[in-house]
Swiss-Prot record:
InterPro entries attached to this UniProt entry: CheB-like, CheB_C, CheY-like_superfamily, Sig_transdc_resp-reg_Me-estase, Sig_transdc_resp-reg_receiver
Any one cellular-component term (Gene Ontology): cytoplasm
Pfam families hit by this protein: CheB_methylest, Response_reg
Ranges for domain CheB-type methylesterase: 145-334
Stated name of the protein: Protein-glutamate methylesterase/protein-glutamine glutaminase 1
Superkingdom: Bacteria
Assigned protein family: Belongs to the CheB family.
Any GO BP: chemotaxis
Amino acid sequence: MNIGIVNDLPLAVEAMRRAIARRPEHRVLWVATDGAQAVELCAAQPPDVVLMDLIMPKFDGIEATRRIMRSERPCAILIVTSCIGANAWRVFEAMGAGALDAVDTPRLGDGAAGDTTKLLLAKIDQIGRLLDAPGGTRLAGTAARAGGGPLIAIGASAGGPGALASILGGLPADFSAPIVIVQHVDRAFAEGMAQWLDGQTPLAVRVAREGDRPQPGVALLAATDDHLRITRAGTLEYTREPAATPYRPSVDVFFNSLTEHWPGRVIGVLLTGMGRDGAIGLKALRMKGYHTIAQDEATSAVYGMPKAAATLGAARAILPLGRIAGELAALARI
């Protein structure tokens, strides 16, 4: 893959160069030392993936990510910055603007076997699989049983944190439907993202744990690199299968499990994101007679997943982000 590096620290740039050089299939296409230069280079020489720092001159990595993803030639962006934990709120803002993931900057003396070098290369490989993926998982075929209350099932990827904050923040405090969210996010950030989202809404937001049951007025966030499913008993479980999918956790896997096992109504929502994950699952939900919503192009940070859903006819409604919370509140009262 062709890789762009955006970082104003020479030692950090050199550490990333050395890590990338260990993979003959990767090469550094260019290096930008500030956000403005990164935007210009992405337009002139689009790379396959950008390794974006957060704190830089002129404008920071969040603003650079936002401008790149809104441009005519958006690029896949991986946040690579020092001390991810201390910069968690910046990471979530960047992911809300369209970044796919985040990882600590590799250490210069790490060597080939160093943890930070291996983790960076693993993240780059994961993004490569995402870019190459044809998308989709197999449709489930078992009918859902009648009865029970509505479950709000939301899938999101790049740009998702900001979209989720907007929707959850727009729901009333007495919103009584259970919510389950599958966001493409590394398990290292899931707990922090749940806490961050919890501060954006009057509802309770926490990570989904094995054996949890969806609770009225509570939003549960998938929290591991495994897939989340609903079981026949109505509890949540994590599973490694299907192992081949590049999306972990997969929105399709969760949506399809609802068509098999959820006993009541489902309202499926597919938000901004790169690729096609969730489109086939949303189609399966609609074919079962459930209400389905996809975010529109104008308000999506990355119009990939909702576009795939629209192409398949999976969405009963295609809505701007600002209208989705109101639609959910109205549908949950029916």
